[in-house]
Amino acid sequence: MKKFLHENGLSLVLIVITVIALAGQILVGWYDFNGELKDYGRPAITLLTYLTTGHCIESVFENWESEFLQMGLYVLLTVKLFQKGSSESKSLSEPEEVDREPSPTRRGAPWPVKRGGWVLKLYENSLSIAFFLLFGLSFYLHAIGGLKEYNTENALKGKQEILSLWQFMGTSAFWFQSLQNWQSEFLSVLSIVVLSIFLRQKGSPESKPVDAPNDETGE
């Protein structure tokens, strides 16, 4: 168990933090939504019922969507683009391990590398593909949740307007929800790319060595 915790500590801690934050968001969202229902003279709903509401679904996947888009684009952009002095960039002049051709004879090579062909080609791009698939799923669920929330709010206000999914995705409300998260995610990536040029964190693989010159590029 001690070995398992040592080898997987980073992912385990991040899972715990994510679950706690998500649970907190759902709980306070439930109270917030019931407060809104109370304002309109409607009865409160249970936590389980709240999980199926647009208020809950939209708030969760609106944020997940931007995270997966950010990571997918970042993975692709760092293949060809550079930033002098940043620990997040590949070297400007020296070849990188990640650019060499995969060898099926390398010890412990994953089976797609040994298989070759289209399987290898897919595996070579599997990280960005996975992020964009997760982005697409989250984008769709955000739209579903946002539509339910939009129509629910109209019903509470006594409005007769009921939109379809495609109609809702064409509204400024939907794109405001998306873009306000997208810009913040890209700003956070820009921050670590630029700040890692000048600032250090001893012991972190996201930082250059403390004594590295500012113009040294890569980790």
Locate predicted features.
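Domain-level detector of nuclease and nuclease-like folds
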Residues: 102-133, 137-140, 144-153
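N-terminal first transmembrane alpha-helix
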Residues: 6-24, 35-41, 45-47, 58-66
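Alpha-helical transmembrane segments and their helix-start/interface "positive-inside/aromatic belt" motifs
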Residues: 1-19, 117-133
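A structural feature that tracks compact, well-ordered secondary-structure segments
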Residues: 49-82, 87, 132-151, 163-201, ...
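Perimembrane loop-to-helix junctions flanking transmembrane segments
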Residues: 36-55, 156-166
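Extramembrane terminal tails and long inter-domain/linker segments of multi-pass membrane proteins
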Residues: 2, 45, 86-118, 203-219
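Alpha-helical transmembrane segments of multi-pass membrane proteins
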Residues: 18-33, 138-143
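Transmembrane-helix bundle segments that line or gate the permeation/cavity pathway
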Residues: 23-32, 77-91
